[in-house]
Amino acid sequence: MGTFPPTSEKRSMEFHYPNFQNDMWRVYGLVFFDDKEHFRKGEEKAFDADKIKAFLSEAGIASCPTVLKAIREKGNASDAFLKVVEPVPLAEVLEQIPDCKHIGTTGGKATEILLSLLPEKVKLPKTGETIPFVFNGRELTLTRLPSTSRAYPLSLAKKAEAYKNFFKACGLQTK
C-alpha cells in the first residue's frame, strides 16, 4: 500500500505507481524476474499496466493506495506535502481479499496513514520491520518497506532486497 498517485502529467500509465521515475515496477521486476526492465513498455518511458495487472493477479498480490482523496500542496509527488482528505476504507478493502494476511506499506507516510485507520494505537515500525496487528478480529502483519521513490536514499538493489524478503515471508516465490 502506497499513498496517492502523482499529478496526471507525471503518469506514464493509468495504474498504481504510474510515474516512470518511481522504481516500484523495477523493484518488482528484480524481485520476481531478476530483470528491472521486465515491466517496461518496450523502449518507451512507461510501464506496461496490462502486464503488471496480469502478474499481480497471477501472483495473488493486491495493490491499493492508503489514500482515496488528497491534496498535493506543492503539486509534486512528495508525500511530505500530501494532505489526506479521505483515507482508503480499509475494512471494505480487506473484505474483498479475505485471504490477505500480510500488508506491506511503501514508506513512512503510507505506514502512518494505515496505522491511523486502526482502532488501537500501534507503534510505527521502522523501515524493514514487521509487526502483528488485529483489524476487525483479523490477525495480520504489517511490514514497512522502503519507499520506491528515487528521492529515498537507498539503492535499487537494497530496495529490491527488502521487497524480496517481504514477499518470501509472505510465501511467494521470488528470483
Question: Which residues fall in each region the model found?
Answer:
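Internal catalytic-core helix/loop-beta-alpha segment
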Residues: 58-117
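Short, surface-exposed acidic-centric catalytic microdomains
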Residues: 9-82
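Secondary-structure boundary/capping signal
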Residues: 36-37, 101-102, 122
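Generic structural signal for beta-strand residues in well-ordered domains
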Residues: 54-56, 96, 135
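Short C-terminal domain-edge/linker segments immediately following a structured domain
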Residues: 29-36, 92-98, 172-175
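C-terminal capping/extension of enzyme domains
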Residues: 6-11, 18-20, 27, 74-91, ...
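Residue-level marker of positions within ordered structural domains that often coincide
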Residues: 6, 33, 68, 108, ...
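N-terminal nucleotide-binding beta1-loop-alpha1 segment
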Residues: 1-3
